[in-house]
Amino acid sequence: MPRSLKKGPFVDGHLQKKVDDQNTKGTKNVIKTWSRRSLITPDFLGHTFAVHDGRKHVPVFVTEAMVGHKLGEFAPTRTYRGHDKDDRKARRR
């Protein structure tokens, strides 16, 4: 269920402050964050965020198609290593 429109989008205050500071200065440094729950707003465009996935920070460059999604959607938390290979030689023994 989506968030109510009367509440507005959720963005952590410290993250919004960092983006606003960089927008006024005109810099595009990487912003390290643990806030996977923050919604991507149009003023995030062109910035790179280092989003924490539980182990490391994954770089996420924000494009226009990402607006309206959450930062955590672009930093997967689980690594899929694939299923075991079907090895016929091992089965024969």
From Swiss-Prot:
A GO molecular-function descriptor: structural constituent of ribosome
Gene Ontology biological-process annotations: ribosomal small subunit assembly; translation
Pfam family, any one: Ribosomal_S19
Biased composition (Basic and acidic residues): 14-23, 81-93
Coiled-coil segments: none
A cellular component term, taken from the record's GO annotations: small ribosomal subunit
Region Disordered, annotated ranges: 1-25, 74-93
Organism superkingdom: Bacteria
Keywords assigned: Ribonucleoprotein, Ribosomal protein, RNA-binding, rRNA-binding
Record family assignment: Belongs to the universal ribosomal protein uS19 family.
Matching HAMAP family: Ribosomal_uS19
Function: Protein S19 forms a complex with S13 that binds strongly to the 16S ribosomal RNA.
Name of the protein described by the UniProt record: Small ribosomal subunit protein uS19
Organism whose genome encodes this protein: Beutenbergia cavernae (strain ATCC BAA-8 / DSM 12333 / CCUG 43141 / JCM 11478 / NBRC 16432 / NCIMB 13614 / HKI 0122)
Taxonomic placement: Bacteria, Bacillati, Actinomycetota, Actinomycetes, Micrococcales
Gene behind the chain: rpsS
